[in-house]
Amino acid sequence: MVLDELISEFDRGLRSLTGISRMSRPVPVPADTPDVELTPAERTHAAGLMRVNHVGEVCAQALYQAQKLTARTASAKAMFEEAAREEEDHLAWTAHRLKELDSRPSLLNPLWYAGALAIGVAAGTLGDKVSLGFMAETERQVESHLEGHMSELPPTDTASRAIVDQMRIDEVKHGKAATDAGGIELPLPARMLMRAASKVMTSTAYYL
């Protein structure tokens, strides 16, 4: 059983890094909004933001894979699995949008994935309450990050905005579920360290 689980997660990791993630929900589309041609500068900026979002989803896959494998209860494992499935949709959506913008994922995705996997293992070894608390804090920070992107994306880029908005809705749900399941609030130094690490990732992934 453990071997089957490891093989399944290894397969998911490969799909995350190779850009062939499976999509269980269709790509969100704007409601009744005509397509507007973006300027070259707008396309470049939107692509940078969506690349950052794609990296975030690569990291989410690694985090939740590691946390699922180290979880001590069946309920925690199920929660990490459900979140990972929805995050896999986000991964596919952002990859799809990057292609539409004639851009590419981050060249450093293997590095981001490996780092997030290590962090997920560390969080998981501290117990389910800490691991769920880490999930809740991660989702809160991602929610804030996505809200910032909604204000930064060109108003005419309705395709990217529809994707980001649905991602934000899902992140709020994941964070609340983790808290309701008993996740504890992380100490301030841990939350600050998470923000600092996120800033390094987002500022780098925008370009690379």
Curated annotation (Swiss-Prot):
Concerning Gene3D superfamilies, the annotation shows: 1.20.1260.10
Q: Where in the cell is it found?
A: Cell membrane
| InterPro entries in the cross-refs | COQ7_proteobact, Ferritin-like, Ferritin-like_SF, Ubq_synth_Coq7
Where, by residue number, does Fe cation 1 bind?
E57, E87, H90, E171
Drop me one GO molecular function for this one: metal ion binding
Q: What is its EC number?
A: 1.14.99.60
Where is the major localization of this protein? Answer: membrane
Cofactor binding note from Swiss-Prot or TrEMBL: Binds 2 iron ions per subunit.
Role summary: Catalyzes the hydroxylation of 2-nonaprenyl-3-methyl-6-methoxy-1,4-benzoquinol during ubiquinone biosynthesis.
| Similarity remark | Belongs to the COQ7 family.
What name does this protein carry? Answer: 3-demethoxyubiquinol 3-hydroxylase
Could you read off the lineage of the organism from its UniProt record? Bacteria, Pseudomonadati, Pseudomonadota, Betaproteobacteria, Burkholderiales
